[in-house]
Amino acid sequence: MYTINKNIIVINKPINWTSNDVVQKVKRIIKAKKVGHAGTLDPNASGILVLGINEGTKLLTKLTLDSKTYVAEIQFGISTNTYDSTGEIISKINKFITLTEIESAIENLYKNEYWQKPPKFSALKINGKKAYELARNNISFEIEPRLVKIFEYNILDFNYEKQILKIIIKVSKGFYVRSFAVDLAARINNLAHLLSLVRTESGQFSINDAIEIEQVYDYWNNINKHSTN
């Protein structure tokens, strides 16, 4: 297991937990004064969440987490208001696409940086309020697009009958895979939303460095016991 500091813990966030849920749970388990996280992970996603404990919170901004790697499943033919499977279905299209079309569209996005607009249902702050809170209350607002980049990708599977793509993708900081799914579909005149998402790498950390929430108590006691010897 890779670690740079005893006050940095890498958690394998369970699905249906918010990043803040994990922070508060860990804080209670180890009775820490302060716990923070680097890189929000959507509730519907699982995988790496890097935590700073007490003095470790000051290290979070210094960590090199400029790239993230995800394994994603994308459902074509259906769009939702959240860009993932938790949202309301907005539209459907009865148009099957091919793997060749998908590969061509990804290549066009892959070559250079491109402007990506984050989902309105996100934790980004708009005038001091979280975007998803505004979206849930049907308040009109706009999110500025940001420059993002795909560093690497590999198509793991494409089920033509179900129109589901499974892909591993390494991307820049601030990249939204939900937006990528929508942008990708738009380039081939289709619709899409994200079915599932697992973050397997965050900067220098990999999923192999992560521990389950149930392991936090023993891990914390063990690492602090050794550090005082």
From Swiss-Prot:
<dbReference type="InterPro" id="IPR014780">
    <property type="entry name" value="tRNA_psdUridine_synth_TruB"/>
</dbReference>
<comment type="similarity">
    <text>Belongs to the pseudouridine synthase TruB family. Type 1 subfamily.</text>
</comment>
<dbReference type="Pfam" id="PF01509">
    <property type="entry name" value="TruB_N"/>
</dbReference>
<dbReference type="InterPro" id="IPR020103">
    <property type="entry name" value="PsdUridine_synth_cat_dom_sf"/>
</dbReference>
<keyword id="KW-0413">Isomerase</keyword>
<dbReference type="GO" id="GO:1990481">
    <property type="term" value="P:mRNA pseudouridine synthesis"/>
</dbReference>
<keyword id="KW-0819">tRNA processing</keyword>
<protein>
    <recommendedName>
        <fullName>tRNA pseudouridine synthase B</fullName>
        <ecNumber>5.4.99.25</ecNumber>
    </recommendedName>
</protein>
<dbReference type="InterPro" id="IPR002501">
    <property type="entry name" value="PsdUridine_synth_N"/>
</dbReference>
<feature type="active site" description="Nucleophile">
    <location>
        <position position="42"/>
    </location>
</feature>
<dbReference type="GO" id="GO:0160148">
    <property type="term" value="F:tRNA pseudouridine(55) synthase activity"/>
</dbReference>
<dbReference type="GO" id="GO:0031119">
    <property type="term" value="P:tRNA pseudouridine synthesis"/>
</dbReference>
<comment type="function">
    <text>Responsible for synthesis of pseudouridine from uracil-55 in the psi GC loop of transfer RNAs.</text>
</comment>
<dbReference type="GO" id="GO:0003723">
    <property type="term" value="F:RNA binding"/>
</dbReference>
